[in-house]
Amino acid sequence: MKTDYKVGELIYDANIYDRLNTFLSDLQFYKKWLPTNKEARILELCCGTGRLTIPIAQEGYNICGVDYTPSMLEQAKWKATEAGLEINFIEADIRTLDLQEKFDFIFIPFNSIHHLYRNEDLFKALACVRNHLK
């Protein structure tokens, strides 16, 4: 039996996610790895509601966010607009990602990588990361 692991809508409600994930204590960890050139293209995979995407964009970085869950992206877009930011948020599966562009830096925050349940899914996602790096 072949199983589609699209569980995003079952596990995450954007409003609940934002209420449970109000912390930004990990932001400094991610920021220390960002390129020094703020014009560098940054891609955040599994960006959710923009918990990290938005503060990084507020620092002047050129960042794009990808997520699988429409409700998360809707919330991220709303929050970015409220913050006066123009961020490109894209609905896509990181296992089959094909944005037709390259990035200087790509990261997957928090525990999102654990949603890739099978090794083949992890390898597909990592191959997509490789294909999108400059």
Name every feature range the model reports, one short phrase each:
Residues 1-48:
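Conserved class I S-adenosyl-L-methionine
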Residues 123-134:
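A short glycine-rich, Lys/Arg-flanked "PGG" loop and its adjoining helix->strand segment in the class I
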Residues 53-96:
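Class I SAM-dependent methyltransferase SAM/SAH-binding core
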